[in-house]
Amino acid sequence: MHEGAVCREIMDIGSAAAVENEIKNVYEIVISVGPYSCIHEGQLNFYFDVLRKGTCMADAVIHLEKDESLTGVSQMYVKTFKGE
């Protein structure tokens, strides 16, 4: 049940990236996850649906992409933000 904290971190990274790149509307976020990340996509999307309201990510979707090459401590990273 750590998806809430993970979602908050994704949103913090996304907000900072949006400001830095003058993006007003983020519409897609791609997260790469390793085989041992233990991220449940349904729970992550549940938290994201709640937390994104009223932000530059209000219309965004999150996609998880499995990456078997991620090993060790780092089992997840934000791969792509798309917006305008």
What spans do the regions from the language model cover?
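Charge-rich, low-complexity N-terminal segments
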Residues: 1-84
